[in-house]
Amino acid sequence: MNYVGQLAGQVFVTVKELYKGLNPATLSGCIDIIVIRQPNGSLQCSPFHVRFGKMGVLRSREKVVDIEINGESVDLHMKLGDNGEAFFVQETDNDQEIIPMYLATSPILSEGAARMESQLKRNSVDRIRCLDPTTAAQGLPPSDTPSTGSLGKKRRKRRRKAQLDNLKRDDNVNSSEDEDMFPIEMSSDEDTAPMDGSRTLPNDVPPFQDDIPKENFPSISTHPQSASYPSSDREWSPSPSSLVDCQRTPPHLAEGVLSSSCPLQSCHFHASESPSGSRPSTPKSDSELVSKSADRLTPKNNLEMLWLWGELPQAAKSSSPHKMKESSPLGSRKTPDKMNFQAIHSESSDTFSDQSPTMARGLLIHQSKAQTEMQFVNEEDLESLGAAAPPSPVAEELKAPYPNTAQSSSKTDSPSRKKDKRSRHLGADGVYLDDLTDMDPEVAALYFPKNGDPGGLPKQASDNGARSANQSPQSVGGSGIDSGVESTSDSLRDLPSIAISLCGGLSDHREITKDAFLEQAVSYQQFADNPAIIDDPNLVVKVGNKYYNWTTAAPLLLAMQAFQKPLPKATVESIMRDKMPKKGGRWWFSWRGRNATIKEESKPEQCLTGKGHNTGEQPAQLGLATRIKHESSSSDEEHAAAKPSGSSHLSLLSNVSYKKTLRLTSEQLKSLKLKNGPNDVVFSVTTQYQGTCRCEGTIYLWNWDDKVIISDIDGTITRSDTLGHILPTLGKDWTHQGIAKLYHKVSQNGYKFLYCSARAIGMADMTRGYLHWVNERGTVLPQGPLLLSPSSLFSALHREVIEKKPEKFKVQCLTDIKNLFFPNTEPFYAAFGNRPADVYSYKQVGVSLNRIFTVNPKGELVQEHAKTNISSYVRLCEVVDHVFPLLKRSHSCDFPCSDTFSNFTFWREPLPPFENQDMHSASA
């Protein structure tokens, strides 16, 4: 019985440890990276697929992933998305590059964020001190006003109670409309916990695990039930949070909650959150990525997360935009009780000085969620909305009465409820627009460049085709933009507006106006009746906000349609020099859009969105019933007139956009100082309570002319697919006999090994440990990159074990690896598998059929071109030099062509002369 008890205990402990390794909440992994040195010395790499589990980065200090290679830190960093994926941030200044929404992101912050926050704090304190004593006592921290701290505390408590009652009533009414809204619950420790900007860490919080100064970390509330844990890049991820009830809350409750959007660092300050939403948005576990709730009552669909090789995770698209449009027409939508408002930043610098903070308070920034539903509206609805909104300039619109603002903006903001969370750094009164104008110019220059594209506006609010990725509505919230979820309308919104007209004027000295273009616009029916219209010399093609002739526009449109990306800027300029007509020796427009102007349309039908020249319907973007349009001017004189007169104000514009990428450039790879062969790499994320979460992998530096052997794992190294996952973890040797010796001898002949399996990325550490564990009398498997599927655990297991279709992943992965070896078109010399699907995958990437081997559970090895020849790993090991000839000749006396010139062919005796007796007799 003692033996039985010990055996049961050992099995229990083993299964428990196995569950810890497979628990989706703690599942982290890294796929090995392959770097290929090209003939010209440049480097190319496979994608950096790194994923952190939920518990490992539950309360991350920043969403910054540090990288160590061979024990030394490198100057490159990755950023962490809300699905746990890590990615690099690539800066681009191509104003015509089309960046999908799920690839847009904000830059990785440096010390500039801390400097800006300190500047904003100083401005806020100075403003509070200038107020009357009662207001100052209410806004200052308790440490500054000890005598009036209790009074301000009681007032804040009454505010929260009133806000709680409103939110509870709204929650009962709209519970079916938005299940992610949660009411605020008050804590019994409200009177003992200071609810302002001066937060302190609790005594039981362990110290940080690194040497980073604590002032760079966001402070943590001492409130035991509603502590806030800000996430990275000063971006507070969307969480179930309270929204100010703009129709029921008195004006004084809405004051001081104006959120300020800082374009280049996405710094956000949000309203106070509920206890249930006090944590930041954390990476989704593998089970959550697959097992989405299907009983949603809202129009939004929580779709399965697709994570393909070489790409970032994005939601599957199942519903068409037209169905969304028909299901919820804008005109028949009932105005809900709770509203979110979006603060629109005008490019005109005088707007900030003309607005008073009182008129702008109460406007919550419109922050996107991880899965955003875009509302499509037709032009008739837009006309009706535009007619209802009185035409007025931007500054006058901001001074409009508050209820009117709520009414005009609610119709389009209500479908996409946003979740905001208030910053703990700015006290009780938030941040004002004056904080931006009073900021130190040196600090402001880090975030608000003076020139560039109008990126601070939503994409649909402008007619131009330029994309400023870091300034999209999803980017300002950080979490939404890094969540990896692509909106179902991205396929429409990412394409630039294209229109054609017979207005002419490209070769004249006059400029092409929008009215003139629309006057001669060509409809679809006209173009269908007369396709030869493209030969008309007066034809003008409008791509975004730029005008071309057909000869110039044709390659641009072809590249966008075929490759979903624009031509390089140098190529476009070369085409324009050859094909575009000249205007008085000067180009007809400035390529970089330096002469872009902002025109405020006063017509009601143009207050909301443009129409008539867009080929597809675009989602309506309303901002205080004001439509700010960007049109391209074509003269330097207009550009000079459009410059703001005052240079002291800040311009929220930038022509630099940021996008996610999983690959590094050749220069970045060279900066890693990799050595030939394997290089250990560690990806780490610092957390406030769990310390540092690490994810280990290997970077392999190979040459373009190396020969690679592909090997499957499940069923090829192990004896079966299913038991190969379980039995080795329990300590049972479930490996084919002789495979370690065979692979070792093949590697000694100069071949590289690549282990490719359709297992999930979360099983990387377990699989890598198994490959290191295989040992046959002192002989181990050769080192090689481990390539796994970046998809979730359960989807990978379902594809590998249940569907038995691993070729879906393998073909995509191996094709990408093969392309890295160019100009070597056949880098894969041989391959080992166990199923017909493996044979199909290997044939697709160019492996010769006579060097594809499959093994069955009995250990019988079959060569595909001669299936009757049944062998084994042990027998193949005996003739390894014939099947896998030696590549490294330094220790060999054989000639390169061993079948023609070798020791045997040189020393063998010549054949005796042979005479054909029949021929001799016939001749006689």
From Swiss-Prot:
Which BP terms does GO give this entry? Answer: actin cytoskeleton organization; cellular response to insulin stimulus; fat cell differentiation; fatty acid catabolic process; immune response; lipid metabolic process; mitochondrial fission; negative regulation of transcription by RNA polymerase II
Q: How is it modified after translation?
A: Phosphorylated at multiple sites in response to insulin. Phosphorylation is controlled by the mTOR signaling pathway. Phosphorylation is decreased by epinephrine. Phosphorylation may not directly affect the catalytic activity but may regulate the localization. Dephosphorylated by the CTDNEP1-CNEP1R1 complex.
- Looking at the record, which segments are called C-LIP? 658-864
Residues recorded with modification Phosphothreonine: T298
Which prosthetic group or cofactor does it need?
Mg(2+)
Q: Which residues carry this modification: N6-acetyllysine?
A: K459, K629
* Record's compositionally biased regions (Basic and acidic residues): 162-172, 285-297, 628-641
Motif DXDXT motif positions after renumbering to this chain: 712-716
Q: Per its UniProt record, what Pfam families does this chain match?
A: Lipin_mid, Lipin_N, LNS2
> What does the entry report regarding how activity is regulated?
Inhibited by N-ethylmaleimide treatment.
Ranges of compositional bias, category Basic residues? 152-161
Instruction: Write out the function statement from the record.
Output: Acts as a magnesium-dependent phosphatidate phosphatase enzyme which catalyzes the conversion of phosphatidic acid to diacylglycerol during triglyceride, phosphatidylcholine and phosphatidylethanolamine biosynthesis and therefore controls the metabolism of fatty acids at different levels. Is involved in adipocyte differentiation. Also acts as nuclear transcriptional coactivator for PPARGC1A/PPARA regulatory pathway to modulate lipid metabolism gene expression.
UniProt disease link: Defects in Lpin1 are the cause of the fatty liver dystrophy phenotype (fld). Fld mutant mice are characterized by neonatal fatty liver and hypertriglyceridemia that resolve at weaning, and neuropathy affecting peripheral nerve in adulthood. Adipose tissue deficiency, glucose intolerance and increased susceptibility to atherosclerosis are associated with this mutation too. Two independent mutant alleles are characterized in this phenotype, fld and fld2j.
What protein is this chain from? Phosphatidate phosphatase LPIN1
* Gene this protein is translated from: Lpin1
